[in-house]
Amino acid sequence: MDMKKRIHLELRNRTPADVKELVLDNCRSKEGKIEGLTDEFEGLEFLSTINVCLSSIANLPKLNKLKKLELSDNNISGGLEVLAEKCPNLTHLNLSGNRIKDLSTIEPLKKLEHLKSLDLFNCEVTNLNDYRENLFKLLPQLTYLDGYDRDDKEAPDSDAEGYVEGLDDDEDDEDEDDYDEDVPPGEEGEDDDDEEEGEEEEVSGEEEEDEDASREGEEDEGDEEAEHGEKRKRDQDDEGEDDD
């Protein structure tokens, strides 16, 4: 599927201005360029174009609210100055798996003042001597490079994977507290009924046990009285024999 058709599909009857997250992974770009994406997507905060055969991002529209951009597994080798102009508020950028060979290609990213996380996995530039040290010097605003900070401490998942989560699910979350999704309609009160029935069974069981214990006690008393009666009878018989 080409990129234009994929964008149309992802809109799902929404207007471009309403879209905050757009995932175009694995579709086909035309001649290695972005197409179908316009500045009408003014509310876009997260854009993913992984493995779409991009070789240029020159056609990227003005996206002032864009915070995270996924460009991994493409054929990009330069032209990154466009990002500072079109996406000035970018905080997360993933360029892993592209044809970036030297630090000079990355230098235009200095103008991205809010850039916090940059990924360059599987790019030739990572093979340079003192790559990490030099890149942190080149981009002092960076907190994380390839998932680790300057002290080689791993980024929290929220930064390593990106901060955007459930941007288009706000409406779905509104009623979550009002009902239990795992309970089918009409069965919400069944658990309470089962508990009440269980309590009633326990009470009746206890009453039966008390009745059994009472009957056993009465039987024991009867046995004792019978024994005493027999003893008294024997005593009387013995007395009669003595009188004779």
From Swiss-Prot:
LRRCT domain residues: 123-161
Presence of the UniProt keyword Ubl conjugation in the record: no
Keyword Repeat in annotation: yes
UniProt name for this protein: Acidic leucine-rich nuclear phosphoprotein 32 family member A
Acidic residues bias: start-end ranges: 157-227
Location in the cell: Nucleus; Cytoplasm; Endoplasmic reticulum
Segments annotated as LRR repeats: 18-41, 43-64, 65-87, 89-110
Region (Disordered): 148-244
PTM per Swiss-Prot/TrEMBL: Phosphorylated on serine residues.
Xref: Pfam families: LRR_9
Gene: anp32a
Native source organism of the sequence: Xenopus laevis (African clawed frog)
A cellular-component GO term for this protein: perinuclear region of cytoplasm
Major localization listed first in the record, in broad terms: nucleus
InterPro entries linked to this entry: AN32, Leu-rich_rpt, LRR_dom_sf
